[in-house]
């Protein structure tokens, strides 16, 4: 008898022996509907407790004009003792009220600034934006959408220094801190993003019935969870995130404490959570050279997602942009996608 010492061997054996309890396996619209109600309820249970809702008390603290777009730096309250700084980008010469899109950043110390293309003339910031084609908040604003680019907890202005833990992943440390209190950082960020939708909907420039979301990497994670639980999102773009927990969490370890809901794999794989967006339109972007989210796992997850949209009888609402690139925003289909559905 061989010794069972290795932890990774144990984890993978557990994964194979205990498939997710609510992994979608239906074919009919009726089966899809029942499954979706069950999984969304379970997901919300896992994400609780959410903070208590408080008045937004929003204020504008800065104005700037650049790239033919009006920028407002805004601050709004999402919970007790919690305020969110964000860039609001309002396109010039566009019919109002216009559709609004919350644009969510991924990992990195600059947070919202990259997505809004606010580089303060610094070369490091400019290179980070160019490398990932990161300024989709600006790109969408230049095409007629009002965009909101907020900082997540522990990023941008919401962290004294993202790198203060040395070689530790700051967002992982922050996630563990919330676990100590029986909270989880993914849920808290999702709550803040839901309040971001509240703020967008409150603006006179925005049509509250035409709201969307987009995010790259960790921003894609946020976009997925936001659209999964908040049906005000009428169209969602998940960029360079769709994968399997088996690949990116259990095999690669390419995740952190801010990127998952504790207990989720007991019930669902990544594509199942993404499937909660159905029947609403969903665009999945995947880079063929993305080492962090290998294309084989992305294709496996997308095939499962296709089965969910097919059962919901809305296959035409699931879009795919598999592009020849790495961990970055493609944009090849995103603008047509949002124009079609918002």
Task: List where the protein language model places each region.
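N-terminal targeting or regulatory segments adjacent to alpha/beta-hydrolase or S9 domains
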Residues: 1-70, 78
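Glycine-rich active-site/cofactor-binding loop and its immediate structural neighborhood
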Residues: 64-122
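Cap/lid segment of the alpha/beta-hydrolase catalytic domain
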Residues: 96, 104-191, 201-202, 248-251
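Mobile cap/lid helix-loop segments that gate and shape the active-site cleft of serine hydrolases
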Residues: 173-180, 195, 234-274, 279, ...
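Alpha/beta-hydrolase fold nucleophile elbow
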Residues: 205-217
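Glycine-rich nucleophile elbow surrounding the catalytic serine of serine-hydrolase chemistry
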Residues: 215-227
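Short beta-strand/loop motif that positions the catalytic acidic residue
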Residues: 277, 284-286
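C-terminal catalytic histidine-bearing segment of alpha/beta-hydrolase fold enzymes
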Residues: 303-342
């Amino acid at each position: 008898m061989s010794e069972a010492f290795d932890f990774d061997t144990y984890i993978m054996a557990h994964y194979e022996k205990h498939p997710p309890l609510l992994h979608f396996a239906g074919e009919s619209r009726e089966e899809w509907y029942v499954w979706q109600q069950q999984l969304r309820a379970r997901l919300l249970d896992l994400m609780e407790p959410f903070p208590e809702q408080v008045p937004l008390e929003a204020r504008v603290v800065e104005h700037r004009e650049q790239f033919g777009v009006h920028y407002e730096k805004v601050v709004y309250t999402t919970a007790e003792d919690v305020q969110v700084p964000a860039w609001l980008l309002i396109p010039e010469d566009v019919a109002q009220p216009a559709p609004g899109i919350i644009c969510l950043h991924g990992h990195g110390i600059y947070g919202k600034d990259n997505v809004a293309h606010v580089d303060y003339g610094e070369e490091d910031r400019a290179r980070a934006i160019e490398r990932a084609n990161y300024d989709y908040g600006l790109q969408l604003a230049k095409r007629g959408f009002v965009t909101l680019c907020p900082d997540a907890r522990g990023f941008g202005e919401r962290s004294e220094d993202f790198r203060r833990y040395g070689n530790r992943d700051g967002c992982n440390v922050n996630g563990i801190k919330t676990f100590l209190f029986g909270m989880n950082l993914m849920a808290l960020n999702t709550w803040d993003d839901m309040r971001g939708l509240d703020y967008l909907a409150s603006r006179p420039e925005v049509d509250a019935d035409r709201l969307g979301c987009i995010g790259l990497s960790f921003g894609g994670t946020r976009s997925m969870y936001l659209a999964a639980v908040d049906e005000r999102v009428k169209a969602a773009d998940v960029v360079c995130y769709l994968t399997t927990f088996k690949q990116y969490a259990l095999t690669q370890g390419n995740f952190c404490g801010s990127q998952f809901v504790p207990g989720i794999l007991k019930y669902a794989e990544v594509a199942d959570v993404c499937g909660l967006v159905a029947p609403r339109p969903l665009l999945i972007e995947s880079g063929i050279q993305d080492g962090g989210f290998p294309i084989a796992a992305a294709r496996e997850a997308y095939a499962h997602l296709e089965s969910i949209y097919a059962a919901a009888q809305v296959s035409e609402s699931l879009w795919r942009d598999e592009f020849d690139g790495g961990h970055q925003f493609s944009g090849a289909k995103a603008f047509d996608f949002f124009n079609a559905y918002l």
